[in-house]
Each structure stands twice: as structure tokens, then as C-alpha cells.
């Protein structure tokens, strides 16, 4: 995928999440946050140890987020260009799963399967890493 295709698909097929991401970005910029680039996506560092959240081609992560976390969120932005409107529902399921994992592992000490065991999360990580390591591949 080219950069041009990424943005065309983000503003057409992936428009619902792109608009939501832009609205959140505007609020954050009003509050003094400044966007940074990661691949073709824009991101904001919010908090210190926040994991991450992608909304369209914009994602949010903590100040100390690893490059793997950023690549994972970047992968979700690429999924937005692939799944478009359906990604709204996958994102809601992903958010519910994230909070389930947080409660079960962090609060209750339960051991759960790897976070990337769900195809959607695994695909985001693999896609994000692929595009960061080989951005000129189409």
C-alpha cells in the first residue's frame, strides 16, 4: 500500500473512525498536546504508561510506550483502510477484550492467553511491524 492509498482509504472507506480520531485530536491539541508521526499515522502521547488506542489514522499511547506497541496501534490504522466501516464493531470488541484482560490479569491475577491470540490483534501487530520495517513494500 502506498502512502497516498493509505490516506485516500482512511478518508473514504475508513471515514467513521478517521473522523472520530480527528475530533479527539483537535480536543487534545486545544489542551496543549502535540501530535507526532509513526509511519503514516499521527499519534499523541497521553499519560505515562497508557497502552494504546487507535481511532482511524490517529492513535494514542503513553509517553513510555514501546515501538512494538506503537507498531501495533499503527497496524490498527492500516486495518481501518482494509475493514472500513466494519472496524467500528471490531474496535468495540477489541476495547471490551482489552478491559477484560486488564481486570482478569492486572486486578485478579489470572493468566490468560497472549493478547495477540485473537486474530484481529495479531494481525494489527504483524501488519504494523511489517509496514514500519518495510514501508516501501506495496
Give residue ranges: language-model regions.
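Metalloprotease/metallohydrolase-associated module, dominated by Zn2+-dependent proteases
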Residues: 3-37, 41, 45-49, 89-138
Amino acid at each position: 500500500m502506498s502512502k497516498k492509498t493509505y490516506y485516500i482509504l482512511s478518508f473514504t472507506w475508513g471515514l467513521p473512525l478517521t473522523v472520530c480520531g480527528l475530533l479527539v485530536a483537535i480536543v487534545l491539541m486545544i489542551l496543549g498536546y502535540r501530535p507526532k508521526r509513526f509511519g503514516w499515522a499521527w499519534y499523541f502521547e497521553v499519560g505515562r504508561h497508557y497502552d494504546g488506542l487507535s481511532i482511524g489514522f490517529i492513535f494514542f499511547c503513553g509517553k513510555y510506550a514501546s515501538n512494538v506497541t506503537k507498531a501495533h496501534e499503527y497496524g490498527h490504522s492500516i486495518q481501518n483502510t482494509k475493514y472500513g466501516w466494519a472496524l467500528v464493531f471490531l474496535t468495540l470488541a477489541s476495547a471490551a477484550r482489552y478491559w477484560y484482560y486488564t481486570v482478569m490479569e492486572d486486578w485478579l491475577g489470572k493468566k490468560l492467553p497472549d493478547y495477540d491470540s485473537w486474530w484481529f490483534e495479531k494481525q494489527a501487530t504483524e501488519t504494523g511491524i511489517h509496514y514500519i520495517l518495510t514501508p516501501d513494500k506495496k
